Amino acid sequence: MRHGDISSSNDCVGVAVVNYKMPRLHTKAEVLDNARKIGEMLVGMKKGLPGMDLVIFPEYSTHGIMYDTKEMYDTASAIPGEETAIFADACRRANVWGVFSLTGERHEAHPDKAPYNTLILMNNQGEIVQKYRKIMPWVPIEGWYPGDCTYVSDGPKGMKMSLIICDDGNYPEIWRDCAMRGAELIIRCQGYMYPAKEQQILVSKAMAFMNNTYVAVANAAGFDGVYSYFGHSAIIGFDGRTLGECGEEEMGINYAELSMGLIRDARRNGQSQNHLFKLMHRGYTGVIHSGDGDKGVAACPFDFYKQWINDPEGAREQVESFTRSTIGTAECPIEGLPNEAARS
């Protein structure tokens, strides 16, 4: 893991993250014009960072947030489509991989159902290698249709990569699912705003450590007329230590070289902090000393996860028993969301 140079090597993937200024757009033409700006930024960055293998742009960087529902549906993208064609041209010209946000992607039943909040991982030939739909839209505000699975794909130089989006990162299950699929770099694109700066910086570092994985965070910056975005795009080592981090500046860039050999060695030879291995070999020292085998315990000890798999409605009722039974809350109502007062 190296930070401070502009190079890379056969062992190291050069990764850049961008504090892209949150745009405020209204039409398809404006979205396409902004996509071209992203493409030109990518090409320009490669001139300054010759080792850059992968550049990551934040959630909402292409479309901005469409606060008007009609605009949100009217500007929703097909994938592949006009926006991805622009990105593909830029990736080919720069010989660089990219992660790009499409908010939204048209639902299969468009316009009868809400769009998805989608990320794509595109290779240096302009081909879409991974398309990820946000599993945990930021309710109650975001109106995206939720996705239903994570993915792992071979990225530049063969590094295993997963995409997650913003509020996804507040759920440890998503990180663990990516890591247990073999992800070596989990890419979190976000459009996170104040007041959650401290928590979001903390959670990405903690999840890198807990999942023995590199993490790259690309976050928006600036003010879009509604929210103020705190930036702090960052690249984090698999030991949870920050390699490089932007401040709050608009269009800030940070860059680091991520060694594949180091993370693979750590996962193979690490012991006390090898969380992925230890989770599936629980208590192996005591089990071995007790004569009960040489692998530890593999069985899941967590009742909640067992119930969630086998009885999702029952698991939901259990959570509602100590939270609330309606989507909304009468003490801070949001239009369109049922709450206890409305129900009564």
UniProtKB/Swiss-Prot annotation:
Keywords: Hydrolase. One of its GO terms (molecular function) is amidase activity. It holds the Pfam family CN_hydrolase. The keyword Hydrolase applies. InterPro entries: Aliph_Amidase/BUP (IPR050345), Aliphatic_amidase (IPR023719), C-N_Hydrolase (IPR003010), C-N_Hydrolase_sf (IPR036526). PROSITE patterns: CN_HYDROLASE. The active site is at E59, K134, C166. SUPFAM superfamilies: Carbon-nitrogen hydrolase. It comes from the Bacteria. Transmembrane segments: none annotated. It is an enzyme of class 3 (hydrolase). It catalyses: a monocarboxylic acid amide + H2O = a monocarboxylate + NH4(+). Catalyzes the hydrolysis of short-chain aliphatic amides to their corresponding organic acids with release of ammonia. This is Aliphatic amidase.
